[in-house]
Amino acid sequence: MAVVASAPGKVLMTGGYLVLEKPNAGLVLSTNARFYAIVKPINEEVKPESWAWKWTDVKLTSPQLSRESMYKLSLNHLTLQSVSASDSRNPFVEHAIQYAIAAAHLATEKDKESLHKLLLQGLDITILGSNDFYSYRNQIESAGLPLTPESLGTLAPFASITFNAAESNGANSKPEVAKTGLGSSAAMTTAVVAALLHYLGVVDLSDPCKEGKFGCSDLDVIHMIAQTSHCLAQGKVGSGFDVSCAVYGSQRYVRFSPEVLSFAQVAVTGLPLNEVIGTILKGKWDNKRTEFSLPPLMNLFLGEPGSGGSSTPSMVGAVKKWQMSDPEKARENWQNLSDANLELETKLNDLSKLAKDHWDVYLRVIKSCSVLTSEKWVLHATEPINEAIIKELLEAREAMLRIRILMRQMGEAASVPIEPESQTQLLDSTMSAEGVLLAGVPGAGGFDAIFAITLGDSGTKLTQAWSSHNVLALLVREDPHGVCLESGDPRTTCITSGVSSIHLE
């Protein structure tokens, strides 16, 4: 029987760059954009002669990229070897497969027969990403449709993916696939790890918070293996906020010490994988996460300006280089940025508390402010509670404006477009619109989709305004849930909603 797991994409509201270093925190929102992994056997029965095999088959299918890859999995070493003619590889999924199977070996040390049988049947793995992870502007424009969420909604679910055109000068400034910056590799890696661990009986995704086979929650096991797979696939130990969000959902995140993965980086070519994973699972994972979500009646919107995305690793590298060349200025910038990030976090938490304690007043204030530009919000500060709510709203805006200024200063000093001029103009006009609390460039910034937090029902007007500025509002919203077990193949569950969809070539 097939196992289907999914994991969400992310939006890093605050903590861009700073989240790379402890103890700086990042506020990260999980979204309704999800990556799915479907795991089932290639063969329904184990062939009698297969018990003597030293290898088994693994098939990896990515329908959106029209790619199918075949591998042989060594049953002794748990390593994958590609046997496909195509040289297109997916290191994230390959590492996820190897480390999930290594964890399964570790978890079933006393009873390997059932695991061995599952592996001998072969592994048929399909990966699917929500359309929101990818840019479909070109197809929409080619079809002569307006740049609106409604046009996006006409796309068939899990539509074919757009590739960025190569630069005329051969430069590789954009990723191969046109993306929106929602952390597709982290969501994909997490979904594959979770689906395989559930399929192989290591975790139970129907109750993932209980203590599992390794003395910690099943979610923690998924997190550790997904982080390891993702970091080794990237060739570096990142902050991990994107994987943490994919596993646990929306949160306030402080990174783990990179040393916890240094053993895996060194040992990956020499030691058996189950030994490496054993050390990882026993390691001191000191990441910190606290539940966080937007205050009530606030909505996340993302707008794609149509630049095909940015290369995050090269931007991070440039910022690190600047830190080393001008440490004093960099420290001052980061301290100010950390203070502004904390201020915004505090204001949003205060608003959540005010909503809980004074719901009726909060509801009226948000409704009133949703149809006004921010300079007119004070007109509704007629009573102490109203005034307190509006004060927090305005101070949250001020904190975001400070964050943007400091991020721009960092970008200028490091010679990277963290908030490029085109994005600045778009963000300024967005923040001056009715009912918009704040707007910014998520994560590392650049030319990815921008985000806005709106009040009440003001989002519709914002998406119309974006469309008139040639910005495509995505269908992404905040969804606080992390990795989960799905009831079936998402392509079949989407059929009813996709009956009226069209296929854009």
Curated annotation (Swiss-Prot):
EC primary class: transferase
A single GO molecular function term of this UniProt record: ATP binding
E.C. no: 2.7.4.2
Pfam families in the record: GHMP_kinases_C, GHMP_kinases_N
Keyword Lipid biosynthesis: yes
TM region positions: none
Gene Ontology BP annotations: isopentenyl diphosphate biosynthetic process, mevalonate pathway; sterol biosynthetic process
Gene Ontology CC terms, in alphabetical order: peroxisome
Residues annotated with N-acetylalanine modification: A2
Compartment annotation: Peroxisome
Motif (Peroxisomal targeting signal PTS2): 57-65
Pathway where it operates: Isoprenoid biosynthesis; isopentenyl diphosphate biosynthesis via mevalonate pathway; isopentenyl diphosphate from (R)-mevalonate: step 2/3
Major localisation: other
Coiled coil: none
Record's keyword terms, sorted: Acetylation, ATP-binding, Kinase, Lipid biosynthesis, Lipid metabolism, Nucleotide-binding, Peroxisome, Steroid biosynthesis, Steroid metabolism, Sterol biosynthesis, Sterol metabolism, Transferase
UniProt catalytic activity: (R)-5-phosphomevalonate + ATP = (R)-5-diphosphomevalonate + ADP
Residues where ATP binds: V177, A178, K179, T180, G181, L182, G183, S184, S185, A186, A187
The keyword Transferase is annotated on this UniProt entry: yes
NCBIfam families the UniProt entry points to: Pmev_kin_ERG8
Record family assignment: Belongs to the GHMP kinase family. Mevalonate kinase subfamily.
Designated name of the protein: Phosphomevalonate kinase, peroxisomal
